[in-house]
Amino acid sequence: MAFSDLTSRTVRFYDNWIKDADPRVEDYLLMSSPLPQTIILGLYVYFVTSLGPKLMENRKPFELKKAMITYNFFIVLFSVYMCYEFVMSGWGTGYSFRCDIVDYSQSPRAMRMVHTCWLYYFSKFIELLDTIFFVLRKKNSQVTFLHVFHHTIMPWTWWFGVKFAAGGLGTFHAFLNTAVHVVMYSYYGLCAMGPAYQKYLWWKKHLTSLQLVQFVLVTIHIGQIFFMEDCNYQYPVFLYIIMSYGCIFLLLFLHFWYRAYTKGQRLPKTLENGNCKSKRH
């Protein structure tokens, strides 16, 4: 009886909550309910932390050089496209970089932003291949809690962003992230091409700097909300989530920077058997 009552309450809560969702995204893939993505992400976590390493335990690492080169440069091109779409749907065509609320209209620009937000959300599922490649190549030391957490929480939280607030100032971090990914995945693609291309990777330290700048800009941009009394952004809870996420990763990268470049400890080699060792965010 108690379980039945709890179930009924949960269903009523979900129905009351979901009625405020943006109807424009109802027919997009994975957007009808959070359940499909939760299942996918649950299977991902199970595979990369348990099943995958067990299956690979007595097997030789897969040689995935061509697949990784193709994958990384595909992400570069996809990120260029998404960055351009973010610019054309708001960030370069009218957004003020301050209190930009969500446009829920059916205007071409608003619908373009909706589509771009969904593309960014979907790209996070493609990027799960980062970890799967680690597992298949038996690079289990790179499958850290931070890595898996990042790749799991990003698509899961972005489902709610697309479902309720596809646009406005809450998308700045996505716009910035697509630009950063163009540089990052270019680096990973060159890494995957082998030792012959190591001479082109002298800018590894600047890659970490770029990621730090990304988190600083995201934190500053979202932090403006505390100083704008008349900002009527529709879902401020998303801004708190974004700011918390930005602050967490800013601190983590500052720690990495201090340990690697300031304290004087040696960095992991840029290449190990032709493959990169680097943070991916």
Swiss-Prot record:
Enzyme kind, highest EC tier: transferase
GO biological process, one term: long-chain fatty-acyl-CoA biosynthetic process
Membrane-topology annotation of the record: Multi-pass membrane protein
Any one cellular-component term (Gene Ontology): endoplasmic reticulum membrane
Catalytic machinery residues: H150 (nucleophile)
Pathway(s) this gene product operates in, as recorded in its UniProt entry: Lipid metabolism; fatty acid biosynthesis
Assembly and binders: Homodimer. Interacts with TECR.
Protein name: Very long chain fatty acid elongase 7
